[in-house]
Amino acid sequence: MNKEKAIVVFSGGQDSTTCLFWAKKKYKEVIAVSFDYNQKHKLELDCAKDICKKYNIEHHILDLNLLNQLAPNSLTRQDITVDKSAPKEGVPNSFVDGRNLLFLSFVAVFAKQKGINTIITGVSQSDFSGYPDCRDVFIKSLNVTLNLAMDYEFEIITPLMWINKAETWKMAYDLGVLDIVKEETLTCYNGIKADGCGECPACKLRKKGYWEFEKEYLK
């Protein structure tokens, strides 16, 4: 297994950007892969491109517009408003069915062609928003499936799986990229860079995490 190269699933948001710079510390060669699925907050792709260009990281954007056709929801349709809070039952309307399944599957195909075994993704079960494809059991299951499907040894690494948003901010701080993550990323479901709209679930979680990080670690 090649332990010197890694591919990062990169959206241009807080979590994947933190993982990207974490990977840069650990591996000699890092490639970022983003997906264009005609998402409503498409500015995230511009953030991803800008970050990779500014910090000299090889970057590829793969076309996955089919996902938009298959899974209409508040992140892929202009006429569907993002839920401001989690529903009592079921998943939030910001959940894109099959997104992480497809992202990781396509990245695995790409990785094999590049002779790379390590795939890094920023999913987290600790602060997850009710998304089933952010759970550790899903990632481990998919890892086994991809290995069997392609007769190749992949290792999917999830640096944020068991840490909360405050600890994710702390990781960025320890990596020396806190300002980059704070100012140059896009997490907002309404497509607003940095601090975002402040109202969508992603912004609320990000803001709460930063407040807890400041309180706990920047005393």
From Swiss-Prot:
Cofactor(s) for this UniProt protein: Zn(2+)
UniProt-listed InterPro entries: QueC (IPR018317), Rossmann-like_a/b/a_fold (IPR014729)
Pathway given in the UniProt record: Purine metabolism; 7-cyano-7-deazaguanine biosynthesis
Positions that bind ATP: F10, S11, G12, G13, Q14, D15, S16, T17, T18, C19, L20
Domain of life: Bacteria
Keyword Oxidoreductase: no
GO-annotated biological processes: queuosine biosynthetic process
A Gene Ontology molecular function term of the record: zinc ion binding
Cofactor detail note: Binds 1 zinc ion per subunit.
Stored PANTHER family: 7-CYANO-7-DEAZAGUANINE SYNTHASE
Family assignment from sequence similarity: Belongs to the QueC family.
Protein name, entry field: 7-cyano-7-deazaguanine synthase
Species whose genome carries this gene: Clostridium botulinum (strain Hall / ATCC 3502 / NCTC 13319 / Type A)
